[in-house]
């Protein structure tokens, strides 16, 4: 019987979720709906891609060494953890009273061209008016709220992967 929670299957699940999330953002939200991603959205996507990259490496090479598995897990967790933190900040900005919403800034491209990276991060996390606007909802949830739910599920998946790294699945003896 196929066991769905093996190390490799869980890594493949993360890769598939990355592909679905990125496809949804690019093809539906950007191309079909016409939304341009705000700086916080871009940073969430970067975190999701980092997670997906580490998960892809883990799924393709299926390392036997616990140390390598843990390093890949940490890289993947760092990516999705980053995305979840950014999504949490984004949700917080969207729930600020209108008079406390930061004004719109010059944009991420300008910041990247003119400011050092540390200052860019500070500006992005300070947020802007475009990050606080709610352009679309589904089931009463804004895009960052939906993203935060997805990222939370992926973090829980990482806990299951850690369990598989520490306590690998043992094959069951065949019944006679």
Swiss-Prot record:
Keyword Cell membrane part of the UniProt annotation: yes
Q: Tell me where it resides.
A: Cell inner membrane
Alphabetized InterPro entries for the sequence: DiS_bond_form_DsbB/BdbC, Disulphide_bond_form_DsbB, DsbB, DsbB-like_sf
Task: Cite the ranges annotated as topological domain Cytoplasmic.
Answer: 1-11, 64-70, 165-176
Q: Which GO terms describe its cellular component?
A: plasma membrane
Keywords, sorted A to Z:
Cell inner membrane, Cell membrane, Chaperone, Disulfide bond, Electron transport, Membrane, Oxidoreductase, Redox-active center, Transmembrane, Transmembrane helix, Transport
Q: Which cysteines are joined by disulfide bonds?
A: 38-41, 104-131
The keyword Lipoprotein appears for this protein: no
- Similarity field: Belongs to the DsbB family.
The protein's matches in HAMAP family, at most eight in alphabetical order, are given as:
DsbB (MF_00286)
Can you say what this protein is called?
A: Disulfide bond formation protein B
Question: What lineage does UniProt assign to this protein's organism?
Answer: Bacteria, Pseudomonadati, Pseudomonadota, Gammaproteobacteria, Moraxellales
